[in-house]
């Protein structure tokens, strides 16, 4: 079945403003009209605090409960009470890491935490900060192919390992991790697994049961919703984590992790975003429709990855980091970082911006990864399912103009 990208693009108002090409989706995706309407509707009709007995407040409670169930279905979580809402994924990573620091201070036990040099720094620095609590950091290094290989964990895991903290997909290179195999190996020695699914979220089906992880964080604004984040974890593990809370807040998930007032209208938007994704799939149940939708998105995005990698390969002076072989696109998302010989990444991004093509430059919050690549910065192009091959062609024309001539022309000349 042909992916209906033309019809999908009509649902995203931002795609039709100033003829813009949004190739910075790893920093935040655009929202469809149904999400914008749900967010605005909440502010217009029920911009009140939850927990009251009057109609609008009860509607807020119902909105949050509905969104919690929607995200649980999106994740294939067995219990919606395992889903916690908050400001962003980074704050949840910090919250869980601080809780584990308290456990190590009070009880000792396992003290080794495995982190990677492929991850966003929010899933690295937070764990490094536990060293004063007695944590010992063990580094899991990516290979030269820009990927983390689960078998490399065998030399790192031991009965001293408390946690493996890793990404499901690299926000810089797009590399996808075999997280189910990571979980299997970690659990074999009694360790837990903390997955950062922020980058992977919009690109394929998420299933916490199949992944086998113990905790997972992701972000709504990378998945076509407004700015918000969510944490999932096994209920018994979340309930056991010490957290700061006022005495009147239940010491149970999700409430113990939702201290203070978060942005309810954005949670309403997240609920609508799950509904939008569901509308792209087929099936008799909500979960089956979501899996169908995310499978369709993954397959369509594979064609975008292939076109993008081929376009970059045709331009002289371009170095692509990580998986560059179009035959291996099943191992990556359509997120590609590259540099253009002799031209700083910022200059490339500025020239593309002048052509109304939005990309990202810098270290992508992965400074250790950049060091491994012997770079201080790169240009990142990150696509999602509303992007098109025609946009890739437009990008390639602009980049070729900046580079001078296509690679084929330089070789033949």
Regions found by a protein language model. Give the residues of each.
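Pyridoxal 5′-phosphate
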Residues: 1-413
């Amino acid at each position: 079945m042909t992916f209906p990208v033309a019809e999908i693009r009509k649902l995203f108002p931002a795609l039709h403003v100033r003829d813009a090409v949004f190739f910075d989706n790893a920093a935040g995706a655009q929202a469809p009209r149904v999400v914008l309407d749900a967010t605005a509707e909440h502010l217009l009709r029920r911009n009140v605090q939850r927990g009251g007995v009057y109609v609008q407040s009860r509607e807020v409670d119902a909105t949050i409960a509905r969104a919690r169930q929607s995200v649980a279905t999106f994740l294939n979580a067995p219990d919606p009470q395992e889903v916690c809402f908050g400001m962003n994924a980074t704050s949840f990573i910090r919250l869980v890491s601080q809780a584990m620091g308290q456990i190590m201070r009070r009880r000792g036990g396992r003290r080794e935490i495995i982190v990677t040099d492929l991850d966003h720094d929010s899933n690295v620095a937070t764990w490094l900060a536990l060293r004063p609590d007695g944590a010992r950091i063990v580094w899991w290094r990516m290979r030269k192919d820009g990927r983390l290989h689960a078998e490399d964990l065998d030399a790192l895991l031991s009965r001293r390992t408390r946690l493996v903290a890793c990404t499901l997909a690299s926000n810089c290179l797009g590399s996808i991790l075999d997280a189910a195999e990571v979980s299997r190996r970690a659990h074999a020695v009694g360790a837990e697994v903390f997955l950062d699914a922020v980058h992977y979220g919009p690109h394929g089906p998420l299933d916490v049961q199949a992944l086998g992880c113990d905790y997972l964080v992701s972000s709504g604004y990378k998945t076509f919703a407004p700015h918000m984040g969510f944490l999932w974890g096994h209920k018994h593990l979340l309930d056991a984590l010490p957290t700061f809370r006022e005495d009147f807040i239940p010491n149970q998930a999700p409430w113990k992790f939702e201290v203070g007032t978060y942005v309810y209208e954005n949670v309403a938007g997240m609920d609508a975003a799950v509904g939008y994704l569901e509308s792209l799939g087929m099936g008799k149940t909500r979960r089956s429709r979501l899996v169908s939708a995310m499978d369709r998105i993954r397959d369509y995005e594979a064609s975008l990855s292939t076109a993008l990698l081929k376009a970059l390969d045709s331009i002289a002076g371009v170095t692509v980091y990580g998986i560059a072989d179009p035959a291996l696109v099943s191992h990556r998302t359509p997120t590609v970082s590259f540099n253009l010989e002799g031209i700083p990444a910022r200059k490339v991004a500025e020239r593309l911006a002048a052509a109304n093509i939005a990309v990202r430059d810098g270290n992508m919050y992965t400074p250790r990864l950049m060091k491994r690549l012997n770079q201080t910065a790169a240009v990142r192009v990150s696509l999602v399912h509303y992007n098109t091959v025609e946009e890739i062609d437009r990008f390639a024309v602009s980049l070729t103009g900046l580079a001078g001539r296509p690679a084929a022309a330089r070789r033949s000349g």
